[in-house]
């Protein structure tokens, strides 16, 4: 617990440059599409952590960046968010980046993650005494699947009794979490990532997904599905929450990160699981309405949006 009596969340994972090119006309694959390019600091863990900090959680981040202009921008964004920056800078390397192409509706058509530096450098950082001390001082741990599997296992070992929350990042990276599913207090993912983890087919029903994840050792999860119902289960109880329709979706980037950050903030503040998920969905809905993966909103805006999220329904 920090001196300000805010619970402290120590996070390990991505903090890099997000580039997004969005078509302003109906997207045509394999062709040049008129559009708009935007870039901003992002990364799964970093986006979620900024949201949690907005909601009253003290935050510390361990990431990796290069000694370039982009790295300086990322460092400034971490400081601006009021997050303790325990990241390591490799002066001779380029900062990781994520580049996405969006269609005219703001949905991702394709994306490239240039993040080899995480693979090489993050596992070594977890052996540092400073990191062990930071984990010991935290109330909870948060990671994303930008870490390779061996680093995730090491972090789970360092956490000991502390809650561990994780973000799946992508279907390709979600499978890295398989060996620590039993250590997680909640895993945040979308339907595609859940199917990658379980090996189920595209037609799998919610109950099947829930049962397969439980059988794999994961006892708590939140699974988003775009405009479809969000599935959340906690031990023996499973819920669905229908997201309200969002007029004028600007950009889907960061919506899943916001879901994680908002839910984690609620859980760390003692909110019941199903209500914390509603808070996470509120943050996600607000994010969908902006061209930023980490928007800033007032408490009044948050409360107004929360009133639009329906109560959770038990999955029977």
Regions found by a protein language model. Give the residues of each.
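Glycine-rich phosphate/adenosyl-contacting loop at the front of the ribokinase-like
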Residues: 1-64, 69-80, 242, 248-249, ...
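A glycine-rich helix N-cap at a beta->alpha junction
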Residues: 77-93
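Glycosyltransferases and closely related glycan-assembly transferases
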Residues: 133-136, 151-163
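Conserved phosphate-binding/catalytic loop of the ribokinase/pfkB sugar-kinase fold
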Residues: 90, 100-140, 145
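Conserved phosphate-binding/catalytic region of the ribokinase-like
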Residues: 1-11, 33, 205-316
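Short gly/ser/thr-rich secondary-structure transition/capping motifs
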Residues: 82, 121-126, 166-172
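Conserved phosphate/ATP/ADP-binding segment of small-molecule kinases
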Residues: 159-163, 168-240
């Amino acid at each position: 617990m920090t001196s300000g009596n805010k619970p402290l969340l120590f996070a390990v994972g991505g903090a890099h440059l997000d580039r997004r090119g969005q078509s302003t006309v109906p997207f045509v694959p394999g062709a040049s599409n008129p559009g708009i390019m935007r870039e901003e600091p992002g990364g799964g863990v970093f986006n979620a952590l900024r949201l949690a900090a907005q909601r009253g959680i003290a935050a510390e981040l361990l990431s990796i960046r290069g000694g370039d202009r982009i790295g300086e921008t990322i460092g400034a964004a971490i400081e601006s968010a009021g997050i303790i920056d325990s990241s390591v800078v490799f002066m001779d390397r380029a900062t990781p980046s994520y580049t996405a192409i969006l269609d005219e509706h703001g949905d991702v058509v394709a994306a490239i993650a240039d993040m080899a530096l995480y693979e090489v450098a993050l596992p070594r950082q977890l052996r540092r005494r400073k990191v062990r001390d930071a984990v010991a001082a935290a109330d909870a741990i948060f990671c994303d699947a930008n870490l390779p599997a061996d680093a995730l296992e090491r972090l789970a070992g360092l956490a000991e009794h502390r809650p561990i929350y994780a973000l799946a990042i992508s279907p390709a990276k979600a499978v890295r979490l398989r060996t620590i599913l039993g250590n997680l207090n909640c895993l945040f993912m979308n339907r595609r990532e859940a199917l990658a983890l379980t090996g189920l087919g595209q037609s799998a029903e919610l109950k099947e997904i829930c049962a397969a994840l439980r059988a794999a050792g994961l006892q708590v999860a939140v699974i988003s599905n775009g405009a479809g119902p969000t599935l959340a289960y906690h031990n023996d109880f499973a819920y669905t929450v229908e997201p309200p329709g969002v007029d004028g979706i600007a950009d889907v980037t960061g919506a899943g990160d916001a879901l994680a950050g908002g839910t984690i903030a609620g859980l760390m503040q003692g909110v019941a699981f199903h209500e914390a998920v509603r808070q996470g969905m509120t943050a996600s809905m607000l994010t969908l309405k902006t061209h930023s993966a980490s928007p800033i909103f007032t408490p009044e805006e948050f409360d107004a949006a929360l009133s639009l999220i329906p109560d959770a329904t038990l999955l029977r």
